[in-house]
A protein has these predicted regions:
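C-terminal transmembrane helix end/exit motif
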Residues: 169-175, 187-215, 245, 413-457, ...
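Signature of the first transmembrane helix
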Residues: 4-65, 98, 102, 128-129, ...
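Helix-loop junctions and terminal segments of transmembrane helices
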Residues: 58-73, 277-302, 308-311, 315
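Hydrophobic transmembrane helix module of multi-pass membrane transport proteins
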Residues: 91-235, 239
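Membrane-interface junctions at transmembrane-helix termini in multi-pass inner-membrane proteins
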Residues: 131-154, 355-385
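Alpha-helical transmembrane segments of multi-pass membrane transport and lipid-handling proteins
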Residues: 84-111, 308-359, 391-392
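N-terminal membrane topogenesis motif
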Residues: 1-22, 77, 81-84, 217-237, ...
């Protein structure tokens, strides 16, 4: 079992690294091609498009993962029927969302975003709602069967297509005007998604037997109920992302500042800073994706020890990218921005957000654990609470003249640190989960490393201290195992 989990994590990490590098390369080119003006407009659309996409996809991906994972052991219904009904539900929800999008397009771009240039580009997101919904179903199916490499290859193909399209499609369109260039960016997302869907569909037909012996039809009610619970949680985040630029711009303009400045600041934070902070997020995503089917199985079999053991190892693995990434970006904020985006815009914000983002790297493990024990409703409530708090803080703090833009940064810091702490205490209460002593030692190592940066002002000394402490932890743990064995 352990071998399977780490094999899946290794597969996802290997492909995830390649996909992330390609995705980063794609983002760097797009950022430089669009310039700050184009990037500000492009990032302004994304939260609303994401909101519509979340509703359209209806969380069918994780729902299918759960149901297929359970179906492997008990086979309560046909996998073939499960897939067919999933696609039908996805088509219906995507169609409803598309109609709503068309009806509200002018209102959103003119009144909410106050940017008429986005009227045409925003319409081109509609095909993406269908395609992302179908991709989610394929992803859920392959992950439920622990076929992690198939979906990973699909992602790899998608990124390659997007990069090719920059040169043969986006760049020529940008020469016409900025609006057509942004439209080309949106269309390229749909083309990449379409190619990935075709690949995954062929893999289902060729390598996967979805016609199992079970003739019991999948229950629409079971699919919809699970999807509603998961969607409620994701919807809360999507609505928050949707309202965030609106609330920020409104509060910022109340102080008498210019709208162009508001768009630029938002573009810097969400176009440069946050993508960099979570640049190694593919590692934690790979971990949480790989452990979910196993956690579901262990919970169903009442194997609590194995359940907690997987959580411990997943948190330990998440610590590595969390600590290294945040320390590097805290120490070299200007250098990192110059390296990736050829600009120092946002260096101050990157330095402020780097360390507080550390805890958010553990979100995924706790969320996977709570989903596995059927606590989707509680997850939705927590997300709703933290998102409301986040928007409320932006609304209040940004309007205070002495705080202004820093109100968004303060709100982000509180938001990034609150959720993982709440998730931890729920896991502690619900499954009697306790962080192992190694976890506390690692936290201490991280704190000492941060303090040493502040004291010595030298990252080299910090790295030496960091790895010496880690070495001490490994030696100490090995010695403890030998002592127990003897």
């Amino acid at each position: 079992m352990k071998t399977k989990i780490f094999k899946n994590i290794s597969i996802l990490l290997s492909f995830g690294l390649i996909v992330k590098v390609l995705g980063l390369f794609h983002r760097i080119i797009i950022t430089r091609v669009l310039t700050l003006d184009g990037l500000s407009l492009y990032t302004k659309m994304m939260p609303i498009a994401t909101l519509f996409s979340v509703i359209a996809s209806f969380s069918l991906g994780p729902t299918i993962t759960q149901m297929v994972a359970k179906n492997i052991t008990k086979r309560p219904y046909s996998n073939r029927d499960l897939m067919i009904k999933g696609f039908k539900i996805a088509t219906i929800t995507a169609s409803i969302v598309s109609i709503i999008h068309l009806i509200t397009n002018y209102f959103i771009t003119h009144y909410l975003l106050q940017t008429d240039e986005l009227f045409k580009p925003f319409i081109y997101f509609i095909p993406l709602y269908y395609l992302q919904s179908y991709t989610g179903i394929f992803k859920g199916y392959f992950h439920g069967h622990n076929k992690m490499n198939t979906y990973a290859i699909g992602q790899l193909i998608e990124q390659v297509i997007r990069i090719i399209l920059i040169y043969i499609f986006i760049t020529p369109m940008l020469k016409i005007n900025l609006e057509d260039g942004i439209i080309a960016c949106v269309i390229s997302l749909s083309i990449g998604e379409l190619i990935q869907n075709i690949f995954l569909f062929l893999c289902v037909l060729k390598t996967t037997k979805i016609n199992n012996k079970t003739n019991i039809k999948a229950d629409n009610k079971a699919i919809i109920t699970t999807s509603i619970n998961l969607t409620t949680s994701r919807l809360s985040n999507a609505i928050c992302n949707f309202l965030e630029p609106i609330v920020f711009t409104f509060s910022f303009l109340k102080t008498g500042m210019d709208k162009v400045v508001a768009d630029e600041i938002y573009g810097i934070i969400y176009g440069y800073v946050l993508p960099l902070i979570f640049i190694t997020g593919f590692i934690t995503t790979a971990i949480e994706t790989a452990i979910l089917p196993e956690l579901v199985t262990h919970h169903k079999n009442n194997n609590h020890a194995a359940f907690k053991n997987i959580m411990n190892k997943a948190l330990l693995l998440s610590f590595i990218p969390a600590s290294i990434t945040t320390i590097i970006f805290y120490s070299y904020s200007k250098e990192m921005l110059m390296l990736f985006y050829n600009t120092e815009n946002g260096a101050f914000y990157l330095k402020l957000l780097a360390i507080p983002s550390f805890l958010s790297y553990f979100d995924g493990v706790f969320i996977s654990a709570l989903i596995a024990i059927n606590e989707e409703k509680k997850l939705a409530k927590i997300n709703l609470l933290t998102n409301f708090l986040y928007l409320f803080l932006i609304f209040i703090l940004v309007q205070i003249p002495k705080i202004n833009v820093m109100g968004l940064i303060i709100s982000l810091i509180i938001y990034l640190t609150t959720s993982p702490i709440i998730y931890f205490f729920i896991c502690k209460k619900r499954i009697n989960y306790h962080l192992p002593k190694e976890g506390y030692i690692l936290l201490l190592i991280y704190i000492i490393s941060i303090c040493s940066i502040a004291f010595f002002k030298n990252i080299i000394i910090t790295i030496i201290i960091y790895f010496l402490l880690l070495l001490w932890l490994v030696i100490n743990k090995t010695h403890s195992h030998h002592s127990l064995s003897s």
